Amino acid sequence: MQTYLVGGAVRDYLLGLPVKDRDWVVVGADAQTMLAQGFQPVGKDFPVFLHPETHEEYALARTERKTAKGYAGFSFHADKDVTLEQDLMRRDLTINAMAQDAGGKIIDPFGGQRDLAAGILRHVSPAFAEDPVRILRTARFAARYRFEIAEETIKLMRQMVENGEADALVAERVWQELAKGLMEKNPRKMIEVLRECGALKVLLPEVNALFGVPQRADYHPEIDSGIHTLMTLQRAADMGLSLPERYAALLHDLGKAKTPPDILPRHHGHDLAGVEPVREVNQRLRAPKHCAELAELVCRWHIIFHQVGQLKSQTILNVLKKTDAFRRPERFQTALNVCIADTQGRLNREHTPYPQRAHWLALLEAANQADSGKIAAECRAQGKAHLIAEQIDRMRLAQIAPLQKAFQAAQDKTEKH
């Protein structure tokens, strides 16, 4: 019985990165051997055991065989006769198909070290095509390391999409990989890879439809709506924004794909037009509620947020109420963060100031100065409970109006200069 450190731990060690999780493979053993040594079985689908002391995962070396379409359609064979190389051969990419023995020696039968040095993602064997999740994983690794994908691998990924393998992916796995990819340093790269292999059209057709849709060059020097979406997503990542914020950045402009051709490159009403496509994506991916809600909120209101300097005080109050800013100020703030990414996610506009965020937050704080509890008590004491909401709005408007007037005056002064 021999044990080897495998997969991501070896890859990250060779890259000089912190090793977070260690996975081990055991050669020359079976389940009875592991149980006799105190290991605890945990794998439902595969022979995986927890070490009695470290609680790290140890898997028996195994081979796999495709039995049906989709990521779950596999049978496996785990026995004492399965070699380390056979186990490594079933893995997705060469950079993940390396092992390290107890003495520190690297076992690399498929050229993983060479590909690491060259910054290449390359599949180990044709068996890569048997698991459609590998399309998403490869795109995610590209986003993490900014590696290029080997020509033969991207070709194989295209064939998988054409053969309908991507259609077999279940929502939970798509969301799981998409969420991980969005949180990588370069999420733009993930979307680019998915588009290059054709998977974006299958998994996120609403995002794919943005590419080739023109925008006004004076607002968007990058012209293409899809490119702007990628730039907004990447800006959100560079800002260190959360998963819900990055997801909202990805979907914020879906309405531009719905713009009638005769009014292009203008996109009047794309904020409203995008709401239904955002809902469709949320439902299809089964996105978590906090992600889904923020994506819809940003899509619906980002243009209004941008144009705060043009709004009347009553409109501002209506927006604060409709976006639930009084009850959920943290979510309101995250929506404004995405608006910064939207503004700066344009060609040569990466450092454009966004005073609207601070102003919206100041408006919300000012409106909150109206003591709703006191107003309600006074109305009830006067027998005018039916006027509570109206009186609260009146007090909030009194707080908002001077702040908005000052902001507009400062804006006018800046424009004149």
From Swiss-Prot:
Magnesium is required for nucleotidyltransferase activity. Its EC number is 2.7.7.72, 3.1.3.-, 3.1.4.-. Monomer. Can also form homodimers and oligomers. One of its GO terms (biological process) is RNA repair. Comprises two domains: an N-terminal domain containing the nucleotidyltransferase activity and a C-terminal HD domain associated with both phosphodiesterase and phosphatase activities. Belongs to the tRNA nucleotidyltransferase/poly(A) polymerase family. Bacterial CCA-adding enzyme type 1 subfamily. The keyword Oxidoreductase does not apply. Catalyzes the addition and repair of the essential 3'-terminal CCA sequence in tRNAs without using a nucleic acid template. Adds these three nucleotides in the order of C, C, and A to the tRNA nucleotide-73, using CTP and ATP as substrates and producing inorganic pyrophosphate. tRNA 3'-terminal CCA addition is required both for tRNA processing and repair. Also involved in tRNA surveillance by mediating tandem CCA addition to generate a CCACCA at the 3' terminus of unstable tRNAs. While stable tRNAs receive only 3'-terminal CCA, unstable tRNAs are marked with CCACCA and rapidly degraded. CTP binds at G8, R11, R91, R137, R140. Residues 225-326 form the HD domain. Mg(2+) binds at D21, D23. Keywords: ATP-binding, Hydrolase, Magnesium, Metal-binding, Multifunctional enzyme, Nickel, Nucleotide-binding, Nucleotidyltransferase, RNA repair, RNA-binding, Transferase, tRNA processing. A single active site specifically recognizes both ATP and CTP and is responsible for their addition. ATP binds at G8, R11, R91, R137, R140. This is Multifunctional CCA protein. The lineage of its organism: Bacteria, Pseudomonadati, Pseudomonadota, Betaproteobacteria, Neisseriales. It catalyses: a tRNA precursor + 2 CTP + ATP = a tRNA with a 3' CCA end + 3 diphosphate; a tRNA with a 3' CCA end + 2 CTP + ATP = a tRNA with a 3' CCACCA end + 3 diphosphate. Its cofactor is Mg(2+); Ni(2+). GO terms for molecular function: ATP binding; CCA tRNA nucleotidyltransferase activity; cyclic-nucleotide phosphodiesterase activity; magnesium ion binding; phosphatase activity; tRNA binding.
